[in-house]
Amino acid sequence: MSIEDYLKGKNCLASPNYDPDDQHSSWREDLPQFKKDREHLTLVNTRRNRTYNTKLNRFDPEYWVVDYNALMVATIIPYGSKSFKVPCQWRTNKDFLGVRWMTEDTFDHHLYRYETDPNYLGLILAFRHNPDEPDKFTVTIQTPEKAYTYRLAPYGFNNKTRRWECLDTKYGTKRTYQADIFVATDEDIPESEMTEVYGTKDYIFILDFADLRTGVAFNGVTINPRNITMISFDCTEAHHGLGKDAYIAAMYNNDDGATFQMEIGGIHTNAALAAGDKLQCIWRYLDVNGNAQAAENEFEVVSYEGFGTSNFSVKCKGMLPGKFIGCDAFYGKYLQTDGPIKQVDSVKWFTNLTVSGSGRKQLGQRKYPQVVMGMGMTSGFDDGYNLTPERQVKMAYGLGYRDWWTTYIGMSHYWKGLTAFQDKETGELITEQTVLDYPILFAGESQVAIHFMSGAYPDRGYDVFQKYMTETWGINYAGVHPINGTTGSTAVDRACAVNPNSEVFDPTQSSGAGGLWWWDLEADKPGPALLHCVGQVGKLKPKAIIWGQGDQDATALAYPGDRNPAPSLTRTKQATKKVFEYLRSLYGQIPIFIQELSYAWGITNTDAPNVPIRTGLPSFLAARRNTWGDIEFRWKSYGLDPALAQYRIEIYNPSNLNQILHSFVVSGTQEANGYVYADFTVEDWIPVMMEAVGSPNPWEFMKWRVVCLYQEREIPSAPWSDNIPLDNAGLVKKTILVGINQFGGGHFTDMSDPTATTANGAIGRKDKVSASTLRLTFAEKAGLRPIQVMPVNVAADSAGMTVGTHKWWNTSSNSPGDALLAINDMVKGLGVKPDYFIEANPWETMYMKDVNSSTWPALMTAFESSNKAMLAWMRTNWGNPNLEIWFQGATTVWFGVAPPNDLNSEATVTVRDKQIQMATANIGFKLGSFVPGSNLYTAYRNVESSWIYYTVEAFHATAIELGEALALNINRATNPPDWSYLRPPANLQGRKLATRDIKMTWDNRAGITHWKYANRHVTTGAEISSGILTSPEYVFTLNDQQNAYNGDTLNMSFSVSEYAADSGAVGASSSFVGVVQNGSYMQTPTQLKAAKQLNGDIIFTWVGRPSWQHFWVVNTSVNDSKTVIFSKEWSSESLTWTVAEQNEFYGLEEGGATHVIFMVSEYDPSNGLVSIGAQVTGQAEQPSNPMNPVAGLYAVFTGDPGNSNIKIMWDKPSVGGRDVRIRNMHVTSSATISDQFVSDNNLVFTREEQVAAYGFTASSVSVRAQEHDIESGALGLTTEYVAVPETAGTVGQGFAKKDSVGNCTMSWEVGDAVQWQVEILNAENSTVVKTEIVVAPTITWMAEEITAEYGYLTDHMVWRVRPYRADGASNVAKQFDMTATL
């Protein structure tokens, strides 16, 4: 073989000229020059393959090899007969060691190779090993198709069953093996170098080639054992990848729909991820049905953040199928990015490799010693570090080398120091630590274990613990590391344990073993549960311990039986202290927090003697209600802080007391006066009653119970059933009286009930009316429970302070009116003192509408004095000296069809101003609401074309304002809405202007700069236009009138309001509906007519009154009646509209208009008004013309149609002294081509003139003709001809005859022609021989003429004929070609 082939990587042991199994030396090859020096590889000349002449035990320790990355170093050393160890030095978190058995021996010389057999079926390899994470130990099994990763679960020996059993009972293989599967003969691994797993260091690994199920949980595909090329045990150290202590604290989906987030804690400081890294885990989640599912997944990393910190958050591809419960196993290994660590030296042991099973246990091997040579050798096994020394030495020795033998390790295996991270303050290299990790050990039994067992993220107990701790410290959720060291059903004292006689740790009790205790007082040593707990901690050092223990001990104390020694409280305390001492001996003087024991003996419930007391049992149930109808449930919690629980209140059906009608859940944090409470407000129970019985009947008798929800347990109380007592004094903290008439009472009636179908003052649903909104708003703003706020309806129909059907105060006797006296007993009977009195819109606003405004001041004086007297009486009589009256602002009333008119705005403003004045005087009155939107009719309900009472929406909006004002003491009188300052515009009027526009005007009040208007159709009410104006006028133009009414109008439906531009507030409106001012006192001109003059002018004439010669004239376009030609004042009874003005407006060249739309009215210059106008519409009267119209006007082509002169002809005038004006017009643009007076009866439009006018010859003409008086210049009416000129008929059939002499006569059919132009052509060269005009349809070509032309006599005749009519019309020439016949 050549050096080039060798450098290209070809097999140096095989010649390319022969079969690889038949090797030869290189002397037979022609070697090329290499750097001018010939180089040879001298190989042993074996000539032929040798047979396998000895045997080798499969998996012989001397024949294992190692492989690892360049940044670490390792070597393999066999010892004993079945063992080897691998000393290693680790330097990065990417260091990875593979300990391999190769199916094909490619490292030995051909004379010493072992046999290749890829079939491992039936073999079982058992051995002891010390991986850094025994539960995550894997082997890579290579096949020709792919490499598989197989997890090796640890096995422990069960002395009872005498079998090796998988220690991973949750995700293990579930297989067991007989005792002799593993036989220890060599030195075992030192215990100090074994990592504890599942509470023991005594375990082995079993590679069963008949059961190669992949997957962490052994639920993947099965590897085919018949074709394996390599077996490589995967070895790492604790710092590998993210680190041994890395764990998944939480997983949750991101909002992008394509990724989820993984929060990881306990990572190595220098660990980093890269996109494409794979993270494997076994985790649990809740599926869509709420069932827990386990999954084994490999997630691909998209990105991460938080390098070197506890905020290590990873974004991974994919979406989680359910809510994260927990992670049972996490593999953050084999990453793309390496990071430095503190140099670690360790030994990986593989001891007592035991091969069993039915598979082939021995392989054939060649062993052919060679002749001894007295020569040395430099190893050809470049980097032979991966082989055992025994293997290398034996082979070199067998090949005959005896002098010296040198092997070397390449430079790639010397230590390459990586950059480490250094502490800025201390200078310490940070290469071996994990990030900020705060391990908290949870130890004890079931009541602590439940934090890990119950629920799903983020609702598990330890989730809440983590969340609180991390929020407190301001670090990432994964920064706090809860460690589950608990074991359920365990006792702290061995004497109290379920099975104190067995020390085998068996938390499931599946094998009848025990080990469920924490301390053995007699032996003074830790129990299996404590050792298991410490094993869960591993090499971590907890910062604190949460301890919860006692259920099992308490049970043993209550039922000791024949236990010996007998359980006692003293022993339990002593054992607990021992546990604490042991833990502190390991972890230092760390704090231990005790989770309170919740346990009870068989004490019975005093409320229900047959119900035993349980921790958390609700007891001392009670219920009470207020007058509004709210219900409060109360109870006490036995032996449990209620804040730790939730409670479900179950209410029984009043029609079937065995059936639960409704339930709801409250938090146990709702506690007052030693009772846990739950409110059942009218807003809560009315919908329930509506669904159950169809009506909101109030509860009187009730049966209910409460169920404590604690740690996934339900602890029900005994039911409570009785009439619900009324207790306003105990429940209500604020009482709100609402008066004084329907504007206040509507808060309680169907007027504010959105579900009601009527609005007549009937009682509304309490959960829907605005009184509910009032008290809910008050409660929210005041920080009270809704049940503590009670509204009370004290309104009387049509009541005012001193006027109305009912009166609140009698001014004549200065004493309470009938409305106030009617509610006195009811208010006193509430059992609570009223805090507020809401005085809604008083009836004064209605009353003042119908009385003279001069009486208003006296009414307002009485209103104020009566209110003061009433407040003083209420405070004294009802026992609350701090009672306040809160005004619900005065509002107006609207009447009429939509849109209604505000006919009461001035009275309303007067009352409202008085309310504001009183509310700002600090005399016990305040203003709570101006009633939002009450300045607009849309806030009112339409009842029989009147808008008096508010809409449902307005009632609720008012209730919100009142509730907020009362709760927060907001006196809105100090900050009224803008619209309350606005007034209806005064002196609104409209005028019909001379332009036929309508102008609406009103007074401009000082300080007002904007107005909002609406113009509506007087018949339909539809809005024509609306908007904001900046001057006190509006013009309804004639054009807009025509658009809206198809003509002008005198009627208007117009409203206008003052408008606050900054806030958008709108004041009360003024309205105008009716006929605007117009000139009806004037008369309409008569005898209006329009006459067209001979010169084209149009004269309008009319007859007016002699005493009134002021007119307004309007001339309108006949093409668009909305376009005014002119509109102006006029002072005579005629007006001339010149033809020039007509032509200019309509874009005409001459003649002017023929139709008109003209109106004339009498006009009053003093006010700009006009009378009803007289109008003429249509064609103007035509003048009598003495001239005759031109007759016989037409045109003909004098040659080829479309390519010849055009002759225009007409009849000459019959009267002497006259000629004809002929205008030749452009057919398309109507521009004048020629204009001339002609005394003859024709005019020729030459071909040259056509081209000049059109750019081409004409195919049609447009001619206008008028008779013209030569002396006077008068013109007659226009006769117009627009057409294609006429042509003569084409020539018909032709004939050719000859006589005996040879003369040829040619003829043709006549048509309408009277003469013809004939051309005789030479038949041979088509030249014209003879041209002649004939008046008869025939021509003769004499024999001698023919002979002269041709030189011989021929009868072949060719001729063409063009026809001419008598008027000169012609057509195309027709050509004939025929032989003359006799």
Swiss-Prot record:
It is found in: Virion. It is uncommon for short-tailed phages to have a tail tube inside a non-contractile sheath. One of its GO terms (cellular component) is virus tail. Interacts with host NfrA receptor; this interaction is essential for viral adsorption to the host. It comes from the Viruses. Keywords: Host-virus interaction, Viral attachment to host adhesion receptor, Viral attachment to host cell, Viral tail protein, Virion, Virus entry into host cell. GO terms for biological process: adhesion receptor-mediated virion attachment to host cell; symbiont entry into host cell. It comes from Enterobacteria phage N4 (Bacteriophage N4). Its main location: virion. Signal peptide: none annotated. Assembles to form the non-contractile sheath that surrounds the tail tube. Allows viral attachment to the host by binding the bacterial outer membrane protein NfrA. This is Non-contractile tail sheath.
